[in-house]
Amino acid sequence: SMRIYVCDTILITMNPMEKKLFHLFSLKSKKEIGKRISLGQGPDEMIRPSIIKFNENQILIFDVATFTLFTYDTEDFISNENTIPLERKTIELQAYGEIGLLSDNLIGSTYNPKNQFIKFDNNGKKVGEFGYYPVVADLSYTDDEKLEAFKSSFVTNMKDRIAVCYKWTDLIDIYDQNGQLKKRIHGPEHS
């Protein structure tokens, strides 16, 4: 699925399955600036990338297919068609799907019935797990049923909060940077 990222006057779209995955646009001129990062398995290519940080200094892109985190200088990424990463790190344990930034750590969703998230340090080494699945009164789940019933996606504010949105239930969990549940929000459709 296509994704859109914005910082200042630059808009980036991530276009899966195109030869060049990222298309850059100027919001001022409303014109395309260029295309970046080839689809593929070469050293500077990616397969399933998502931008997890985009500011005036740097762009962090995680390729979920190779568990690799790429760091780019924002100015170089925008102005240089053949931009190369300043740094490339492989995440130690395979996170399942999404990766987010939380303070100085990376957070990855897991396919684990005990904890929803893995926390990684700056070097991609696992430093902990956290996140508890909701408990439903009068229901007990097998591990596989629990993983399916509480499928979720998450977003971070990059500093100290994670919002977990469940796909099949009207529920949002908010965690802090230490993995403590701060708030559980039930919507009108919650059952």
Please report, for each region that a protein language model flagged, where it lies by residue.
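Short glycine-/Asp-/Thr-/Trp-enriched loop segments that recur within the blades
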Residues: 1, 41-48, 90-93, 136-148, ...
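Conserved beta-strand positions in repeat-built beta-propeller and related beta-rich domains
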Residues: 13-17, 61-66, 108-112, 164-167
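Blade-loop segments of beta-propeller domains
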Residues: 31-65, 85-90
